[in-house]
Amino acid sequence: MVEDRSAAMTAILGNPIKVIVFALLSMSGSALAVQPITDLPLQQDAQQRWHLPAGEYRGSFSVDSPMQIVCEPGAVFQAQGQGNGVTVSAPDVTIEGCTFLDWGHDLTAMNSAVFLQPKARGAVIKGNRMQGQGFGIWVDSTHDASLIDNDIQGDPTLRSQDRGNGIHLYAVRGAKVIGNHVREARDGIYIDTSNGNLLQGNTLEDLRYGVHYMFANDNQVIDNITRRTRTGYALMQSRKLTVTGNRSEQDQNYGILMNYITYSTLRDNFVSDVRDGSTGDTMITGAEGKALFIYNSLFNSIEHNHFERSAVGIHLTAGSEDNRIADNAFVGNQRQVKYVATRLQEWSIDGRGNYWSDYLGWDRNNDGLGDIAYEPNDNVDRLLWMYPQVRLLMNSPGIELLRWVQRAFPVMKSPGVMDSHPLMKSTTETLIKEPIG
């Protein structure tokens, strides 16, 4: 048998082409092989945690039993451009403090730095650094995962659509995604068909969408920050979302986009400096730098938010009616409201409306409310949309005369938005200040 094997090797080595093929096959096999994490030089401490010493660990690894893995400084998983960095298929696994580099970039195969399989219930992925072309963390059909304080960076040399998402939840329940920093990936956090999850305190920069919801219900989006994305918060086909205390700064196209959203709450959010740009997505058209865009969304509460210095403050269309909109501030937007529908919408609740920086009314009884209604998209506004050059006369006596005629002869009015009790002062000053950190 030894002689036969030796003869075979001699035959291979005697042919240069066969040598190359043999080497390539050997390299491919070793790169694709998934190794048990227990093959690494793990050291257990008194708290039953397994420590991975500093060093570069090449290849893909699997965790198939409950354990806590803590990487010492300098411990690096280098997947050599193939597959996942680590695949977890057991419950109650913790991976903390590790660095993941150069995992696979096959998005169809869902290549990820850390891939949590359905059996990985209760996984904790904490304080890791990830840099690569595929997905950062993919959580697949499991419950109660905690993704905390991870730093995830994509590859800016690739087109946005060719990168993986920083964090991807699919069919997940009870996940906590807290304090992560994601940049230069495709979407920062993508939530698909996943209910009852919490996204809190994440920073999401230089992405397509910062937060992207699809078919996900009963989720909380709290105190997150998006910057320089092509849409800060893309909320689509979902219900019962609680979106509070978030910030959108210098995003393109949309700060917050609501598409088929129902029975949800938007409160205490701050959106500023949204400018127009390319969405890179055929699903969404008409991007004009809108702080808030509401498309075919009903029965939502939108209260005590601040929208400023954007091309459009708020745009409603496609049957977006029966929403509670009050106590918001619309400040310094080039166009405060764009509304396309067939019936009048009242934007005040219990005698209190919104603050509009371009409101020209007065408050003779000092009750903090304007004495005349604010109508941001009356016939005069429609005239300004059709002929932008007329905007030079915006506050002229002629324009005010047209508005007076419209109020005096309401038969001329077309359906639009009315705020019957506009606020004379904004109530959202506390939202304007820069966040700590």
Stretches found by the model and what they are:
Residues 79-87, 107-117, 131-139, 159-170, ...:
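Extracellular beta-strand/beta-solenoid scaffold signature
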Residues 51, 62, 70, 78, ...:
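Extracellular beta-strand solenoid repeats
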